[in-house]
Amino acid sequence: MSNVYQLGLGDKKVSIRLPERAKARVLVPDYSPALVDVAAAVRKALTQPYGRPLDDLVRGLKRVLVIVPDRTRVAGLKEYLPVLTKFLADCGLGPEVVQILVANGMHQLAGREGLPEFLPRSVLDGLPVSEHDCHDKTAHFLAGKSSRGNSIYLNKKVAEAELVILTGSIGLHYFAGFRGGRKAVLPGVASFDTICTNHRLTLRSGEGFHPKCRNASLDGNPVNEEMLEVLRMIPPAFVLNTITDAAGKILRVFAGDSVKAHLAGCEALKRDVTVRVPAKADFVIVSCGGYPRDSTMVQSHKAIDNMAPILKDGSPMILLAENRHGMGSDELLGWFDEGGVAGIRRKLSSKYTFHGHTALSLSEKAARFKIYMVSSFEDDVVRRMGLTPAKTVEEAVTDVLSANAGDLTTYVFPEGSETLPVLEEEKGAAAS
């Protein structure tokens, strides 16, 4: 007797067959139903926001900047952005006033040919659109210095605006606590050095990662605190954030004050994605949730990070992650040649980069667990990261079951990048 499960891998669904002895339990977020009328929900959020309505804020303005997420984010952009831009047009703000800036952070630029993949055609044809390049020093201005000494360089278009509208989705983030809100600015439209200095706050000298720099953690999180500081350095900001399911369907919309609206969304998401488990697992199978959540290794490794607290040390994990856009950084793979966890940590303490951080996080998990990865990578690339390559899920499952006799406590996560599993006794501390 066996059970069959369907998990996402890129744009496809793959079947996984597990025997009864695996004692598999499927764990998914408890999302609210998808919105039937997204346009109506967005308009309501804009006119009844947390704080002043958007039509009141934009009255008489000559320069409005709309910051949107890049192609790595599932945000429902093609649904909500046309509603937002029409709302602005109805307020008398057209292409001579409104422009779009893609918040790439340190991610790869999409290029003109890649923009239609995630931006609606009506916006591309109707408004000026540009991409933020964190490496283009001529495109940045000094907004100020944070209390921790970080020189905050941002895209000049922010300084030129009278109002900045921050859009995107709210989701878990493995060291900033949550995506959305303030992250559209830092790291979204910040310079490379500014981003690296902010992200370096995740490390404590000689002690590894800061304990507050983790999923669903905002209070006392130095990365988040500096991001909030930056909001006070820029023109007035209005947020439009969504919560989506793995298919990209919009479930909720939050708008208004850049702090209050985002916090309300974080609280709602936390309730949705936190799942209880009675004990640590002997075996975990996790999908990122398909494309674009498994678009690059930078994105895919977040699913591993989410699972680590509820898997027994030394136990197997199977990760389904297509990684069609590769590593997500030209430098990431080289970090795995630094001599394991200790070597990466040494180099990172003297020369911090975000991708070194990712390499350290992944290497720590690879040292604790046996992680199989089903992906589009060549086997040698997977092994270089300390992971075990598998051509198919069946191959990985067979290997795990043959190496582990008897019953197993198995958890299956179809939406691992957006699921926060916690042990039942730790449930109350999940959002501290």
Predicted regions mapped to residue ranges:
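N-terminal amphipathic/basic leader segments beginning at the initiator methionine
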Residues: M1-K44
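Short glycine-rich or small-residue beta-strand-to-loop segments that form or flank ligand, phosphate
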Residues: R63-V74, Q99-G105, I285-S287
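Histidine-anchored nucleotide/phosphate-binding helix
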Residues: R73-L93, S300-L311
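Short internal beta-strands
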Residues: P95-G105, P316-A321, K370-S375
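An acidic, phosphate/nucleotide-engaging active-site surface
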Residues: A110-F178
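Membrane-embedded hairpin module used as a gating/binding unit in multi-pass transport
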Residues: F209-Y291
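C-terminal catalytic subdomain
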Residues: D294-Y372
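Internal helix-turn-beta structural module
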Residues: G356-E418, E424-E426
